Amino acid sequence: MPVLAIVGDGGFQYGIAELATARQHALDVTLVVIDDGGYGILREYQGEAGFAHTGVDLVHLDFAALFDAYEIPVRRSERGRLRDELAWALEQRGPSAVVLEDVLRMPVPSALADL
């Protein structure tokens, strides 16, 4: 059964080693990595609460090059092209990926805004 995983770049870095498993076993998984340069949700929480952004910005990693290193088909995308790039990725056999370079916002304020 095909799997679609949508993950931020910060969280994705906790499980990079699993790319080897996906590649070795030709797992039918498509990854969409939202590359916003750090722990975006934590950055949002800190900003909403009026705190300075601390410990949430990461060194930029070329995620497309990482997927290439594992010989996993990958496309870079941006918001206006995501639908087409995702359709391409879902057509691939075995693992595939789309790297979306964008900053997404939380749809609703967190409870931290009330602090």
Could you say what each language-model-derived stretch is?
Residues M1-L115:
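Thiamine diphosphate
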